[in-house]
Amino acid sequence: SGYNVKGLFMQNWQNEPGEECTSEVDFKDASSVCDVLDIPLHRANFSDEYWDRVFKNFLSEHEKGRTPNPDILCNREIKFKSFLDYAFKIGADFIATGHYAKLIDKDNNRFLARAKDLNKDQTYFLHEVKENEFLKCIFPLSELNKEEVRQIAIDQKLITAEKKDSVGICFVG
């Protein structure tokens, strides 16, 4: 019983040679976590898809004087399409993400709902993801607050336990 877990690291931004690349630091952190948890780590590069389906839209909207939110498009177009498809190709039945959100099953439907930690709730960033794409998703942080998540990481001796929260837009770091 239980799950056969695989780690999957997604890279959405391709830095120019010589530019600082936080995704490499993030990949090393993910690799360290997977080593501690004794699970394999796969790496997927979605930078082309991200450029075409998220960043071009961001630039276009910005040129029109609007303030787009690339995280919403990244979730809709990359995390819950490209990432999901890739996960299934390598044998996944479900994906689990670190989003602070909850999924509720009712009357043969799956609904997005707010997480327990309202300060970290990410449902706004997920509101454009289609219901059918949530059918194969698990949000294990839905009933936890940030302090509980940090404590679990500390207890497991994960290198990311004290890592600063990400507050940037999706493609930066």
Predicted segments — roles?
Residues 1-128, 147-149:
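ATP-dependent adenylation/nucleotidyltransferase module used to activate substrates
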